[in-house]
Amino acid sequence: TIFLSLVFVVGVIYLNASQLKPVRGQMRIGVTYMTMNNEFYQTLNAEIERVADEKGDLLLVRNPELDEEKQSQQIDYFRQQKVNVIVINPVKGDSPKIIASLKRAQQAGIKIIAVDSQLSHFTVDASVVSDNYQAGVLVAQRLMKQKKEAKILLLEHKGTISAEQRIQGFLDTIQSEPAYQ
């Protein structure tokens, strides 16, 4: 299932970006994930890199390490490098700095594709997201199948819409169950 999702994500990225490819030359793609410490982003990036290599395109990958200022600077760098498309998994979906940098990129004619999270008050050219609320529900259901009771500690990443949705799905599923605190 994850592999099929990755194939779909890469397909959407290339379908949207291929409309921008110069008649001659390579497409330039800037990619910034919120972190590369997550296996999902490592796997996604490996697949995008594989396809970019096959097509002879240039892939610029940056890791903001959960720092919105750094991600904003990376977007500005991509704009200066005249990439055709920016693929972003935003550190913070409502960050004024990130949104301002994306607006400058869009004004420069760069297409923006959001992956696995949304941006508030900004319209992207394409978005590929999973149902994060449902993912939270599934995690809670699996926990309840494996454990009859549990004391739960949730770590949050405030401002990340996808993480907030997963947590909400989890909480909504277990809230009526007194065995899970």
Predicted segment positions?
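Hydrophobic membrane-insertion alpha-helices, especially the h-region
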Residues: 2-14
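Periplasmic-binding protein-like
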Residues: 83-92, 111-115, 153-154
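Extracytoplasmic "Venus flytrap"
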Residues: 30-46, 60-71, 77, 92-93, ...
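Ser/Thr/Pro/Gly-rich low-complexity linker/stalk segments immediately outside membranes or between
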Residues: 17-31
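Flexible loop/hinge segments that line or gate small-molecule binding clefts
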Residues: 94-134, 145
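Signal peptide-proximal N-terminal region
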Residues: 46-61, 175-180
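An alpha-beta-alpha
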Residues: 48, 138-178
